[in-house]
Amino acid sequence: MSDQVNIIPIQKIGEDQRGSTHIFETDRTGEFIIAFRNKGSLSGRHYHKGRSDHKNPEKIIIMKGEATVNWIDIKTGEKGVAKAIAPAMVTIAPWVWHEVVADEDMVVFELNALADGQGDTFQLEQ
């Protein structure tokens, strides 16, 4: 695991014939994003500078499915790959370009609103 991208397992607190129940903690409130991604699709492909509190770090929860997170630290050039298997929280530090590859159909819960990325989302060529 690195300081740039972390995969944090989501704690299971119960399971029965209906399925399982998991918990996580966050200090974030307000609007959130739920994304349904098809197998093979790419998301992200950008980085944040941490101007928005909710992008410092960026936090997404893989609720269903599996993803590969490719990343590059913009400041150091360090590169890495992390595998997230639901349920898991992915944290992405500022100044880390990231690409989320849906290894299978997946459901993603983002702990931020669309407005949080405005003015704090950059492509590699910027």
PLM regions and their residue ranges:
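Short acidic-glycine-tyrosine-enriched beta hairpin
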Residues: 14, 73-94
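A short, N-terminal "cap"/entry segment at the start of jelly-roll beta-barrel domains
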Residues: 1-34
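Glycine- and acidic-residue-biased ligand/ion/polar-headgroup-sensing regions
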Residues: 55-72
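Short, surface-exposed beta-strand-loop junctions and turns on beta-sheet-rich folds
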Residues: 51, 75-77, 107, 115-116
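Double-stranded beta-helix
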Residues: 3-6, 99-126
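Conserved short histidine dyad/triad with adjacent acidic residue
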Residues: 14, 34-56
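A short, compositionally biased micro-patch
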Residues: 27, 62, 85, 93-95, ...
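Short beta-strand His + acidic residue motifs that chelate non-heme Fe in jelly-roll/DSBH
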Residues: 21, 45, 69-70, 92, ...
